[in-house]
A protein has these predicted regions:
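Positively charged, small/polar-rich N-terminal and surface patches that mediate targeting and assembly
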Residues: 1-106
């Protein structure tokens, strides 16, 4: 199967946690790039009640060959009991960017 670019998204309760996890993923060559958003407000149902809270979204640019490993790594380190971990296939990535991703991820 051909290697495909993907984005993995997760949310964290603090910016510091999201930056730390993103930095480690890049340092460990599991992601080419990590981006942490500004504060977002999440609204969700938990334990029968509607709740809301501030979170920070971590976006990891990686390859399909790292998907299983990166999901397991994120799940193991995540502070939430039920972690939001989403995988989004990227239908287009600029050729030069994709080549760079393939160079730095292993």
């Amino acid at each position: 199967m051909e290697v495909q670019p993907i984005q993995i998204i997760s949310t964290y309760p603090t910016r510091e946690e999201a930056v730390l996890v993103g930095g480690e993923a890049v340092q460990l060559h599991m992601a080419a790039c990590a981006q942490v958003t500004s504060e977002i407000t999440s609204i969700y149902r938990w334990e029968g009640k509607i709740r809301s809270g501030r979170e920070f979204q971590l976006k990891l640019k990686t390859l399909s060959t790292m998907e299983t490993q990166l999901i397991a790594w994120l799940t193991e380190r995540h502070p939430y009991k039920v972690a939001e971990i989403l995988v989004i296939p990227l239908s287009y990535v600029a050729p030069d960017y994709l080549s760079w991703m393939k160079e730095v991820i292993h």
